[in-house]
From Swiss-Prot:
Family matches, as SMART domains: ZnF_C2H2
Protein name (Swiss-Prot/TrEMBL): Zinc finger protein 652
Function according to Swiss-Prot or TrEMBL: Functions as a transcriptional repressor.
Tissue and organ distribution: Widely expressed with higher expression in breast, prostate, vulva and pancreas.
Family note: Belongs to the krueppel C2H2-type zinc-finger protein family.
Skewed-composition ranges (Acidic residues): 98-109, 152-170
Phosphoserine modifications at: S57, S100, S197, S204
Disulfide bonds: none
Originating species: Homo sapiens (Human)
BP GO terms, sorted: regulation of transcription by RNA polymerase II
Biased composition (Basic and acidic residues): 71-97, 171-183
Coiled coil start-end: none
Amino acid sequence: MSHTASSCQELVENCAVHVAGMAQEDSRRGQVPSSFYHGANQELDLSTKVYKRESGSPYSVLVDTKMSKPHLHETEEQPYFRETRAVSDVHAVKEDRENSDDTEEEEEEVSYKREQIIVEVNLNNQTLNVSKGEKGVSSQSKETPVLKTSSEEEEEESEEEATDDSNDYGENEKQKKKEKIVEKVSVTQRRTRRAASVAAATTSPTPRTTRGRRKSVEPPKRKKRATKEPKAPVQKAKCEEKETLTCEKCPRVFNTRWYLEKHMNVTHRRMQICDKCGKKFVLESELSLHQQTDCEKNIQCVSCNKSFKKLWSLHEHIKIVHGYAEKKFSCEICEKKFYTMAHVRKHMVAHTKDMPFTCETCGKSFKRSMSLKVHSLQHSGEKPFRCENCDERFQYKYQLRSHMSIHIGHKQFMCQWCGKDFNMKQYFDEHMKTHTGEKPFICEICGKSFTSRPNMKRHRRTHTGEKPYPCDVCGQRFRFSNMLKAHKEKCFRVTSPVNVPPAVQIPLTTSPATPVPSVVNTATTPTPPINMNPVSTLPPRPIPHPFSHLHIHPHPHHPHHLPIPPVPHLPPPPALFKSEPLNHRGQSEDNFLRHLAEKNSSAQHH
């Protein structure tokens, strides 16, 4: 110990001489203090300190290099210690100071512990631990002195005692100390990095916007995602619950209960529901009208007693049929006018050549599905239209309409000018044009005008020579349907068996002894004149067939003409409807057939 004390005194004297020379050179600094021994607690910022422990009580030897530095705050007072070495080490230090390289290394070792400090701070900016650090790790560590904890001081004391007891292991101890220091430095580096990242996050200046509001460092999206992620299953469950909110009175589904309640208040509580059929109405008047009709098709027109199922159908009927509406919509092809656009679309099918609806029984094609449906009634024999007054059934609707005129007393459509009534609106419209003189349909070939389109088409066949009506018996074709009908009657009488009743036989003057066939007798013997007036030749009912008076006797101008045998007395064909004894021309059927007979007879004379 005496050797170490003497070496320390010599070292102190050398340092004091050096310091005194520096003080004399610097004229701006104050006087050098007389004594260099001070207490352990100093308020000055000391650059170098050398401590030595004697008899367990440390004392300090002060070497002043900064005499005029201001005093520091009391909170920054920290004791600094230096490790003691063996006598041999002290002499080595003296020799090394003569060399500049050794002195620089020594100064770095001395300033190593003085300039480095690591402060561990948590997220709340609270100090957790203070430890050593590397040189130049952070700007704060350069300015603050090194703080040592009590545990580190105890370790150093134990190390100094160990070095005093054994000088042989001095070099080994240095290496171990260096290794420990390296380990501590590595640990402190990690801690400083963590503390620096936390401090940067907490103490970094927040950016400002143009309005001076601070922006948060962490983006708000991350916070929202972090909060939404755990709530995702909960939200899905809520959505599933919302989707199950169904209305009890209708199959509608709602997302929230608010929408369901609103739907109940608006739709079901305010709607008027029929007790019989459950149909809903917005107005009470509509419900009362519906109940008066007993939920059936009984909404009748006051003018024509036509029944409808819906109220808007009745309004449309009143506008169209009874003259309250105008035909504002016209066809682009034929310029035909209609009351509604729906009627125009339905009419456009007539201009197309496609017939997609085909009858499975006979193969006939139609343009409209309704036409096929009506046609199929011919094969099935079904009569879906029933009269409510007499329970008579009909195959077509227009037949029922014609039949209803018997119960009503007049037909549905009546002319206000002449009082003539019609069962179908088509015939009524054609009749009204006779009063107005309107003939909108003009023949493209000759320019003749007609009141209806069917009449114009019928007239056009005279120019084109078209004969669309073939006979099923002989295959002959005709231009008009009435001509085909007359031809069928003629063919039927030619092919029928000859069974002439005695009431219809015409007496012929022949010799009783020699009976001769009527074919020969008609050519040689004179016959009484026959009145060709068809009215006088027809006996009372049962009326013979209208064509029975034709070709009974040949004319004298045609001697080679063979007479046709008489035809049996057949009843006339029944009328199409009981309530419609008139044909399409408005004449009696018998008169019409007689007119045809006269026409044919006159043609034969010529």
